[in-house]
């Protein structure tokens, strides 16, 4: 439900992205359905669920600067995305100092905060699916705190990460109920 953060674990390189695509209504599962408000409606799911940092799908190219990432995401959100607006967003977020840094070189926590904050600017977004934050390294508790922070704003948050990160968060992160045997066989 909304206002909650859930963790799903998935191994192999492709599986987290596949789960993310299914959970965000961008791919049909072989079996089962994704429901929003109890009804199956892929276009509504796609509008309401932001797929965040999914490898090869929604992650920014590694050599792109933070400034460019922010400018593009502001545009996708229907916001002013000119250099002045982009600089203002970065300043307000306290990130102007890293604006010229390639996104691949940004600390994991800052990278995820940038991408999550920009995702929630989109008009209809009610839920976030964050894919493989553990691939950037760092402490899983840091990105889990981010997930809980966004859930605290009333968003539904699903984080899909590897089992090692899941083990670190055992007892802390509420688990998503997904039948792994039916997904991406």
Regions found by a protein language model. Name each.
Residues 13-15, 56-60, 133-139, 164-166:
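Short acidic, S/G/P-rich loop/turn micro-motifs used as interaction or catalytic elements
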Residues 1-2, 120-122:
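Phosphate-binding P-loop
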Residues 114-121, 148:
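Short alpha-helix immediately C-terminal to the ABC signature
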Residues 1-10:
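Pre-Walker A (P-loop) beta-loop-beta motif of ABC nucleotide-binding domains
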Residues 123-126, 135-168:
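Conserved catalytic loops of ABC-family nucleotide-binding domains
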Residues 2, 85, 149, 164-185:
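Actinobacteria-biased recognition of intrinsically disordered, low-complexity terminal regions
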Residues 54-114, 124:
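ABC-family P-loop ATPase nucleotide-binding domains
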Residues 10-76:
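ABC ATPase nucleotide-binding domain signature region
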């Amino acid at each position: 439900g909304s206002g909650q953060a859930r963790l799903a674990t998935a191994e192999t390189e492709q599986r987290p992205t596949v789960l993310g695509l299914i959970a965000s209504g961008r791919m049909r599962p072989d079996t089962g359905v994704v429901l929003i408000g109890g009804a199956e409606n892929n276009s509504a799911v796609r509008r309401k669920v932001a797929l965040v940092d999914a490898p090869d799908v929604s992650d920014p190219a590694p050599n792109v600067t933070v400034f460019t990432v922010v400018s593009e995401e502001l545009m996708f959100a229907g916001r002013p995305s000119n250099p002045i607006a982009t600089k203002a967003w970065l300043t307000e977020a306290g990130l102007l100092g890293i604006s010229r840094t390639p996104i691949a070189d940004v600390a994991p926590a800052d990278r995820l905060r940038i991408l999550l904050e920009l995702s929630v600017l989109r008009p209809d977004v009610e839920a976030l699916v964050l894919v493989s934050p553990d691939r950037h390294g760092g402490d899983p508790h840091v990105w889990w705190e981010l997930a809980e922070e966004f859930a605290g704003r009333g968003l539904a948050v699903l984080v899909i990460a590897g089992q090692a990160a899941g083990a670190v968060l055992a007892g802390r992160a509420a688990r998503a109920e997904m039948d792994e045997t039916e997904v991406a066989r």
